[in-house]
Amino acid sequence: MEHFIDTYLYELRKVRDEKTIKKKEYLLKHLQDYSEDLPAFDQSEIFSFYEYLKNKNLKETTIRDILKEVRLFYEWLQEQGLNLKFDEKALKKLFQSKKSQEALKSKKKYYSDDEINLILNAIRGAVEGISTKHPIYYILTIFLLCSGLRISEAVKVRKKDFEVKRILTEEGEEKEVWFVKVREGKFGKERKALIYFFRPEWKRIFEERLKKLKPEDFFFTYAVKYPKSVKVFTLTDKTAKWFYWKLEKELREKGYEIEVNAHRFRNTYITKLATKGFPVNLIADWVGHSKISTTMDVYMEAEREKQLEAILERI
């Protein structure tokens, strides 16, 4: 393969500038890493190559450039008399499928588990090229996912607003059920919301944090160390929204097409509880929807999105 690529680039140097040649060389290097021989790119091989590139954490735009350059390289090979297949219809089908999936993601109302992991990892500094954020934003994100509160409601929660009830299950086992009191909800209404820890480690994070707070303390009080002092702040909805806006911007710059906003955390809470079998009327009470139809709409749209995603994955 190396001989053919070198010859291809040599011929192109006669008509293209060196910057373009270097880019093409970089793009074709991924083909060399993928296979020692020149593969026949039928639909199965094209999709396999795409998944290989995806697993290298390359940007979607870079993957497209690689596939397009490989197609041009194979056209040149065919002109040289080599009988090597490259299924252009399959490539077009792949691009259309991925375009549909990206469009779906851009308007999707809830987060998948992979998207939740991406956001949390970015906050922890576990995504390459993104610095570690203050731990308060990790806790805030978990809280929004587990409580369904609006961000304006969440930042006003105090330690005394948490309530842990112990109930007996049908099997006779004791189980904890967590609630949070929303004192200043939308339209000034008070309510209680179920806190459902979708992962056991999240509950432990909350337990440890509550131990450090006094009853009147805001839950989202945090300290920032400066060279000569430590200052204590209470998170505001404006600061939190600004944080998520900046985080989304950072992720997009690294090639991750994802929206990061509190409302989608809220909708994720609704969707997860509904799929676990919680009655929609109870969920509506917990999230403070005045109409049960609003809650039902979120759930039904999420179900339609999941069905569409499953279809697109099979294309």
From Swiss-Prot:
Organism encoding this protein: Aquifex aeolicus (strain VF5)
One GO molecular-function entry = DNA binding
Q: Where is the active site?
A: R150, K186, H263, R266, H289, Y299
From what superkingdom does this record's organism come?
A: Bacteria
Entry's Gene Ontology BP terms:
chromosome segregation; DNA recombination; establishment of integrated proviral latency; symbiont entry into host cell; viral genome integration into host DNA
Protein name per UniProt:
Probable integrase/recombinase aq_aa09
In the record, the note on similarity to other proteins reads:
Belongs to the 'phage' integrase family.
Q: Which Pfam families match?
A: Phage_integrase (PF00589)
Q: What residue stretch is flagged as signal peptide? A: none
Q: Where is the Core-binding (CB) domain?
A: 1-78
Q: Which ranges carry the Tyr recombinase domain?
A: 106-313
Q: Which keywords annotate this record?
A: DNA integration, DNA recombination, DNA-binding, Plasmid, Viral genome integration, Virus entry into host cell
Protein function = May function as an integrase.
The UniProt transmembrane annotation reads none
Read off the InterPro entries from this record. CB, DNA_brk_join_enz, Integrase-like_cat_sf, Integrase_catalytic, Integrase_recombinase_N, Tyrosine_recombinase_XerCD
